[in-house]
Amino acid sequence: MSVNAKTVIEVLYPEYANQAGDNGNAMYLRACLPDAEFIETTHDDVPYFAEHVPSLILLCGMSEAQQVNTIKLLQPYRERLVELIDAGVPMLFTGSAPEVLGTKIVNPDGSETPALGLLDFVTHCNIPARYHDVVIGDLNAPERDEAIKVVGFKIQFTQMEAGASQQPFCRNEVGFGLNKQTSEEGFRKNNLMATWLIGPLLPLNPDFTRYLLDLIGEKDAPLAFEEDVRASYEERLKTFRLPGMGLAY
């Protein structure tokens, strides 16, 4: 096992973990970190993280069928993922990707798909019901003195049932969380961050992206297109608070 001095970002299964524009997260990181090494782990590859310690592991949204494939592909490396999570290695799962981390996915017909069991929650897939909203939340980052506001969109077929001990990714001021009955959105365990927010997340959230870059050791890296990104961010902080905004998506 090796630890890299250079920033290495592993993007898992980009050939299908790219739904709803979620591949824009990796695209934006490339723009922010032109000198970093990006490793795209595809379906037939042994993950880089199996023998190395990447600076960041990124997995984005995918279809229900590809969730099943992803669980099968990652299952042999489950204990390695536990080791990396416990060591505080940064990981970001966005869109529907967090659903592979739970204990199981309950399908519309009542059948169950066992998941990786890295986090204590159950996913209930309710196709054809669709849940959508806009979100403004406060990032779960207790080490910071000032709150980081996170914005994004939610478009999903699922509602999550979380165990009592889980910590959220953020606590929503606007929009629903893991399900319609809670404002707690996503999960955080050490530096594993899992969120259903899309947009994509990183180009929509300069303050969170700054936080993530600092977390992976890139404190001096500038945010790409910062003026435009911040203007968009500030506009969403205003418009997402308008009554009825969630009904438009």
PLM features: what roles do these ranges have?
Residues 9, 95, 198:
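Residue-level signal for inorganic ion chemistry
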Residues 179-216:
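A glycine-centered loop/beta-turn motif at secondary-structure junctions
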